[in-house]
């Protein structure tokens, strides 16, 4: 998580589609300094009671005001993080992705790379073609406002089963 390569790759992922934003232009112009800033921020973000070299540099989440957006016929409540917070999210995802993907059900779709709607559609079509009973219907389910209902304590307990690094769990 602290490697320069991971921090730079996360930024490369973050900036896709955002290259006109002022903060992205600034980071592009000062990339080496900003990568070091992210490194120092992560290094100085530790659980309470753990000594750090410079606690003022540690990550402190901002208070966000929810924003309502209309997307794909749905109303969504989102929280827009500041650019460095987004960058940290991308770093966390880079580290978590192989852990989560490796233990997920192989037909979980939607939130995994290369397992979107087209992947799900192809799987269902394959099952329907090879079904000896001649099934012609299936049910597509979307849990309304699912992310709002996730219990953080349960999520963190499940992550702790797969991740033994207390510091990384704290950053999450």
Say what each PLM segment does:
Residues 2-18, 61-66, 93-99, 129:
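Short, compositionally biased low-complexity segments
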Residues 5-8, 32, 36, 81, ...:
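Non-catalytic, well-ordered alpha-helical scaffold segments
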Residues 7, 41-74, 87, 170-172:
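Reverse-transcriptase-like RNA-dependent polymerase core
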Residues 17-25, 62-87, 103-115:
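Short, conserved non-catalytic motifs in the polymerase core
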Residues 92-105, 168, 172:
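Active-site palm subdomain of RNA-directed nucleic acid polymerases
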């Amino acid at each position: 998580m602290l490697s320069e390569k991971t921090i730079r790759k996360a930024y490369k992922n973050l900036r896709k589609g955002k290259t006109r934003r002022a903060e992205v232009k600034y980071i592009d112009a000062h990339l080496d300094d900003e990568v070091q800033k992210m490194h120092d921020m992560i290094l100085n973000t530790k659980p309470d009671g753990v000594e750090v070299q410079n606690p003022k540099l540690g990550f402190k989440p901002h208070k966000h005001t929810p924003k309502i957006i209309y997307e794909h016929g749905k109303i969504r409540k989102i929280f827009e993080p500041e650019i460095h917070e987004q960058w940290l999210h991308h770093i966390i995802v880079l580290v978590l992705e192989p852990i989560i993907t490796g233990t997920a059900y192989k037909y979980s779709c939607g939130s995994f790379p290369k397992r979107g709607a087209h992947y799900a559609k192809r799987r269902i079509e394959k099952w329907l073609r090879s079904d000896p009973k001649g099934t012609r219907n299936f049910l597509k389910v979307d849990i309304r406002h699912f992310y709002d209902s996730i219990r953080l304590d349960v999520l963190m307990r499940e992550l702790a089963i797969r991740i033994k690094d207390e510091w990384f769990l704290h950053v999450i």
